[in-house]
């Protein structure tokens, strides 16, 4: 079998990536740091059916994206270019983005702390019996970890932050974690960005619930309404408030000047004779009281009627009445 040349491999890669872009409209950009070939193979098997994982050098991926954009006129795909930084891969999918992202996360595997590795998380060693004999205390002393000898073994007294996130793992830390059998890190494909029909967004968006989306939408409408009212720019949300404010302003002008309109006449009347406020309030109170009185009277009539019916009943059937 003739081995393909470097140029032929590039052409084949360009063809494959362009075909995938034509077929799929959703792409997950994933970081692949410290991911082994076996682990990557398992991820491919797990996503088989509606997703395809494609790895490659950034320069090759960028070139293929540009070629596809030039040949197809699809300029939206160029939004991928700024995302192709570092050790990344592409997952083309037709499935639900959240479900695919969750499936990818299942394939993280534990890994030991190797010397020189940048810690992705804080590493804290919890207190407890280590199972190591007293001759191993030198490891703990170098790292200033308080210990005591308990039943012939070394016991850590308090929790110790051994490595901070972002720090490089030293030889002493790596040796101690190996002796304790601790694999503090886990590695796998990590979704960094999401491309969907030309739009690019953070993977955190996939975790938003419907309630959170509604809340954010309502908050956005409130902000737009406030801005529209502040600059007197009519929008659908601000229009009712603008009409009410305009009516109040017109009413204030009518009260302060001789200009008038039907709705302002009643206000002017009340302002000229404030006692009419009392009359109006009394009328409202009387209406409410009258309704209560009528209800009370009706209840009393009904009560008397029931008493009368009871008397008739007792008069007609008094079998034990004395003569």
Swiss-Prot record:
One of its GO terms (molecular function) is mRNA binding. Ribosomal protein P0 is the functional equivalent of E.coli protein L10. GO terms for cellular component: cytosol; cytosolic ribosome; ribonucleoprotein complex. This is Large ribosomal subunit protein uL10x. Keywords: Phosphoprotein, Ribonucleoprotein, Ribosomal protein. Coiled coil: none annotated. P0 forms a pentameric complex by interaction with dimers of P1 and P2. Residues 308-323 have a biased composition (Acidic residues). The modification Phosphoserine is found at residue 308. One of its GO terms (biological process) is ribosome biogenesis. Residues 287-323 are annotated as: Disordered. It comes from Arabidopsis thaliana (Mouse-ear cress). It comes from the Eukaryota. Transmembrane segments: none annotated.
């Amino acid at each position: 079998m003739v081995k393909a040349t470097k140029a032929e491999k590039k052409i084949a890669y360009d063809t494959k990536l362009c075909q995938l872009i034509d077929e799929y409209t959703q792409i997950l950009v994933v970081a692949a740091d410290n991911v082994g070939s076996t682990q990557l193979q398992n991820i491919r098997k797990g996503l088989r059916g509606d997703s395809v994982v494609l790895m490659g050098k950034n320069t090759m991926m960028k070139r293929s994206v540009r070629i596809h954009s030039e040949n197809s006129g699809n300029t939206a795909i160029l939004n991928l270019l700024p995302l192709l930084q570092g050790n990344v891969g592409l997952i083309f999918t037709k499935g639900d983005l959240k479900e695919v992202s969750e499936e990818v996360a299942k394939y993280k595997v534990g890994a030991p702390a190797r010397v020189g590795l940048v810690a992705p998380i804080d590493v804290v060693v919890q207190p407890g019996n280590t199972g190591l004999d007293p001759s191993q205390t030198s490891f703990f002393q170098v790292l200033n970890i308080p210990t005591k000898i308990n039943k012939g073994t070394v016991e850590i007294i308090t929790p110790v932050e051994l490595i901070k996130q972002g720090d490089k793992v030293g030889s002493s830390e790596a040796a101690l974690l190996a002796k304790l059998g601790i694999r503090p890190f886990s590695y796998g494909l990590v979704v960094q960005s999401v491309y969907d029909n030309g739009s690019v967004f953070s993977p955190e968006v996939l975790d938003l619930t419907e309630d959170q989306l509604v809340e954010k939408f309502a908050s956005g409408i409130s902000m737009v309404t406030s801005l529209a009212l502040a600059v007197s720019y009519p929008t659908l949300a601000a229009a009712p408030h603008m009409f009410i404010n305009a009516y109040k302003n017109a009413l204030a002008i009518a009260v302060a000047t001789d200009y008038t309109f039907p709705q302002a006449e009643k206000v002017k009347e009340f302002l000229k004779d404030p006692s009419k406020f009392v009359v109006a309030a009394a009328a409202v109170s009387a209406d409410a009281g009258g309704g209560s009185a009528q209800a009370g009277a009706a209840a009393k009539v009904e009560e008397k009627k029931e008493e009368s019916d009871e008397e008739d009943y007792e008069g007609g059937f008094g079998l034990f009445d004395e003569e």
